[in-house]
Amino acid sequence: MINRYTREEMGHIWSERNEFDTMLLVEILASEAQAELGIIPKEAAVAIREKGDFQVERIREIERETNHDIISFVTAVGEYVGPEFAKYIHLGLTSTDVKDTALGYMMKQACDLLLKGLRNFREVLARRAVEFKYTPMIGRTHGIHGEPITFGVKLVNWMSEI
């Protein structure tokens, strides 16, 4: 993403740090579900939630050795969780399980942000439509002048499309 053209909130959603944070959330939730099912010890899920962390630079450092993004991520998180419970991180999961789930959640976050912006934009259009309900303007049809309308009507038409 090009920073100067990116809203700060959207940039955060698609940042490398947030991608890893979201992957960690997937790993935490998976470990908690596995603990509930008796697949891993409950203490492991607690340790993964409470101690699970990472440094992006450390992930990159490990990735230069492993040439695998998920192995480097799991290894880096495991360094924080500790050797007793690190073996339970990513247990029974594939790289795609984690990456695709994280990506889907990030897309949901992005859509929520876009929808919030559209709702705000719709409110502005509604308010401005009332303000300009008597302001005349030339209507358009087939790319040429048409019957006169008001700017308020134009704004209401745009609003109805949102």
Regions from the PLM with identified roles:
Residues 1-161:
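A helix-coil-helix interface module used to build multimeric assemblies
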